[in-house]
Structures are given as C-alpha cells and as structure tokens.
C-alpha cells in the first residue's frame, strides 16, 4: 500500500482494505469517513448487527480476545491496515500479525499493547515520560487493594485496569465504600479480571480531551502533530454525558495540555488520532488517560469542525493531509436507551431536530439498556453555552420507546 499516494476501488483487485476491530458508534463514523474516500472496509465486533456492521462492506462476529480467531480473520481478509476501536483485543496477536508483515496496525501494535489497559499507559506516562499524574497504585487482590486505598488516601478513584465507558469505576470516600468498590471493579473489567488501579483524587476545575493527530505533513512528508481545540466534557461514573468545543482555558494551561499530549502520542508513535484526557486546575494540568483512536467526547466534532475526529483519523491513517481547525462552537449530549429491550424505537425526533442548530446521531445498536448510549444530540451555537443548551434540549426531546 502506497501511503498517501494511491487509493483503490472497493471490491476490486485495486482496493485499499481497512479492517476495524470494534464496530460501535465511533467505529461506524470512522467507516463512513473511510468509505467516502473509496476505501473497502471490513468491520469486526463481538456481537452481530453492531452499528459499524450496518455500513461496512463486510462484517464478522468473533471473540477479538481469541488470538487464533483474530489471526484467522486477518489472514482471510488480508487488510492493508488494521484499526483497533476498542481495548478488548488480543494485542499480542496484533503484534505478531504486524511483525509477520500481514498488515499495518494503527497507530502501531506497541501502542495498542500499551493502551489496552490503564497500567501500561500510566507507567509510560508517569514513570518513563515523567508527566504529571495523580498518585496511583495497582492491586490484584482485595488485601492489596485495601492497602492501596490506605496508601493513596480517601477520596480515591478505583478503576479496572481494562474497561471502557466508565464500567467498574467508582469513588471511595469512606471505609464503607472499599468492599463495594472492589466488587464493582471486578464486575466491570472486560479482560484481566482481578487487577485495578487506585488513583488519588485530583481537585480539578474541569476535564478536557485534547484530540491530537499524528499525520503526514504534505510539505515535508514527515509525521507532524496537530491539535484540535480542547473539548470540555462532563462525566458521570466515568461515562461521558455531555461535551462541548472549545473549552475556555488559560493560554498557559492550553500550552501545558498540548505539551503533555505531544509527549505521550510521540512516545506511542504511528499515525492517527488520539484522545488525550487531562485534568485542569487553573494553570496546572494532569495527564489522565489516552486512547489511540477517536474519543466518545469527540463526537461533538461532527458539528464543530470542518473535519470531524473521524475524518481526521481516516485521513491520518491513510497518509493524507488533515485540517483540525474549529468551525463553530458546538456541543453534544447523550441519548440513553432508558429501557432494556431489543429493537427499540425513538419518538420526539421531529421536536429534537426543530431545535435551532441541532442534529442527531442514532447509533442503531440492536439492543438497548437503561444506561446504554443509543444516540447523541449535536448542536451549534454562537457560544458554547448556547450550543450546550440546544444539545441538551434536543437530547431531552428524544424518547426511547418499546417497539412491542
């Protein structure tokens, strides 16, 4: 594959083939961005009819933590690029696939190994790169966990080393919270059951996601780091419920945020978009986490930027020029399923889209749960505050209902 020079025709011998591992709502938008550039896309997920399956050229259902199954699907499809969109993947198998020359892993196989769990990336950030982080400790038994809580102090945040969307995450405020927090973390981890990170609580003013792109500079043909405007967000129990762009912040804090994002993404290497999560208090900034892929809080860029985070990711991995410039203030607000049922319907769509500057993304997930993210409302505005009000109003207008 000639990076940045040539794209083929899908479903033909000249096709540029990309395989996504994980086909949720973020993967779906990446697939759409790739298909607009004439890329042949294969979507893989652990359950059928995932959002990305519905728009890909081909779809597969496998256990992506099974190295043999992962290797087999790669050998059958022969993609040029493999794009992980979730953490629960047999990353050692990806490293072997890349080493064998079967495909290029985005951003790199090493990056997927380091970021697949919170331990790898925290040790890289704090111990190798010397980035400011909250105090932390790891534990793989309840006894070690209790000792870690005592060492870090209360309040502290407890997370499985491997989970997503806030699953298994809680705050320990008193001794009575210790055992429930351990049990909740054990239930919420996707893989590597039994290991958690205990983090000291950072008294921050706000959280941001610094969307950071490593892409080819067309002028020099070297890899260059680009930054989107900071994305502010609100999380509840570790799960994003609202985001907006740009987040107002001091010039000093913005510079520190970008320095941290540059250091950690440069250490991970490769091409693509990274979501770097940071805590900010005044001019001080702490590193929290990084995902080597589009970030859920970055859904706002579908409305705020000329090239969304998904288009930036698609262009970057293909070696094409990127433009992360902000177009307008915008916001996003999550639409939850509200009920446990397959094949739900949504009412109030007309009212939601009647909100000035509003748009919707209904993800098409086949099964709803009360707190499952089933869609998102987007809105633009003259200011961030206006955009946030509009997005929340549009989201509130959408009513998930039983299709029975």
From Swiss-Prot:
Q: Which residues form the ATP-grasp domain?
A: 123-318
Top enzyme class, one word, equals ligase
Provide this UniProt record's keywords sorted from A to Z.
ATP-binding, Ligase, Magnesium, Metal-binding, Nucleotide-binding, Purine biosynthesis
Which pathway does the database say it acts in? Purine metabolism; IMP biosynthesis via de novo pathway; N(2)-formyl-N(1)-(5-phospho-D-ribosyl)glycinamide from N(1)-(5-phospho-D-ribosyl)glycinamide (formate route): step 1/1
**GO cellular component terms?**
cytosol
Where is N(1)-(5-phospho-beta-D-ribosyl)glycinamide annotated to bind? 25-26, 85, 296, 365, 372-373
Reaction catalyzed: N(1)-(5-phospho-beta-D-ribosyl)glycinamide + formate + ATP = N(2)-formyl-N(1)-(5-phospho-beta-D-ribosyl)glycinamide + ADP + phosphate + H(+)
GO MF? ATP binding; magnesium ion binding; phosphoribosylglycinamide formyltransferase 2 activity; phosphoribosylglycinamide formyltransferase activity
- Residues bound to ATP are 118, 159, 164-169, 199-202, 207
> One of this protein's GO BP terms?
'de novo' IMP biosynthetic process
Q: What is its EC number?
A: 6.3.1.21
Recorded hits in PROSITE patterns, A to Z, give: ATP_GRASP
Residues the record lists as binding Mg(2+): 277, 289
Quote the function comment for this protein. Involved in the de novo purine biosynthesis. Catalyzes the transfer of formate to 5-phospho-ribosyl-glycinamide (GAR), producing 5-phospho-ribosyl-N-formylglycinamide (FGAR). Formate is provided by PurU via hydrolysis of 10-formyl-tetrahydrofolate.
Q: Which HAMAP family match?
A: PurT (MF_01643)
Please state which protein family the record places this protein in: Belongs to the PurK/PurT family.
- State how it assembles: Homodimer.
What is this protein's name?
Formate-dependent phosphoribosylglycinamide formyltransferase
Native source organism of the sequence: Burkholderia cenocepacia (strain HI2424)
């Amino acid at each position: 594959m000639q990076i940045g020079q040539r794209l083929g025709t899908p479903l033909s011998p000249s096709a540029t083939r990309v395989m996504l591992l994980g086909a949720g709502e973020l993967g779906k938008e990446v697939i759409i961005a790739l298909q607009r550039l004439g890329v042949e896309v294969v979507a893989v997920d652990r359950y059928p009819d995932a959002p990305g399956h519905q728009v890909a050229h081909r779809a597969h259902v496998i256990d992506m933590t099974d190295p043999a199954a992962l290797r087999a699907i790669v050998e059958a499809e022969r993609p040029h690029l493999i794009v992980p969109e979730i953490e629960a993947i047999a990353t050692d198998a990806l490293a072997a696939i890349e080493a064998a020359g079967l495909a290029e892993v985005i951003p790199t196989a090493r990056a997927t190994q380091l970021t697949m769990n919170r331990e790898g990336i925290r040790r890289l950030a704090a111990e190798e790169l010397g980035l400011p982080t909250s105090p932390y400790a790891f534990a793989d038994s309840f006894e070690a966990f209790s000792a870690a809580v005592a060492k870090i102090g209360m309040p502290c945040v407890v997370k499985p080393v491997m989970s997503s969307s806030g699953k298994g995450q809680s705050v320990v405020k008193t001794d009575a919270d210790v055992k429930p927090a351990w049990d909740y973390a054990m239930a919420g981890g996707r893989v590597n059951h039994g290991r958690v990170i205990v983090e000291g609580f950072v008294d921050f003013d706000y959280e941001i996601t610094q969307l950071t792109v490593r892409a080819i500079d067309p002028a020099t043909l070297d890899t260059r780091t680009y930054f989107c405007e900071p994305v502010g967000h609100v999380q509840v129990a570790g799960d994003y419920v609202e985001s907006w762009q740009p987040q107002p912040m001091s010039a000093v804090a913005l510079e520190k945020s970008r320095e941290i994002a540059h250091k950690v993404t440069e250490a991970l290497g490769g091409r693509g978009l990274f979501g770097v999560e940071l805590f900010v208090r005044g001019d001080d900034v702490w590193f929290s986490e990084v995902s080597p892929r589009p970030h859920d809080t970055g859904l706002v860029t579908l409305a705020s930027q000329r090239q969304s985070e998904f288009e930036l990711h698609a262009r970057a991995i293909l070696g094409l020029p990127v433009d992360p410039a902000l177009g307008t203030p915008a916001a996003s607000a999550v639409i939850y399923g509200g009920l446990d049922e397959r094949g739900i319907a949504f009412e109030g769509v007309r009212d939601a889209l009647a909100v000035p500057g509003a748009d919707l993304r209904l993800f098409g997930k086949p099964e709803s749960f009360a707190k499952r993210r089933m869609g998102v409302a987007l809105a633009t505005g003259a200011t961030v505050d206006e955009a946030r009000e509009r997005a929340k109003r549009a989201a509130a207008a959408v009513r998930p209902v039983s299709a029975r």
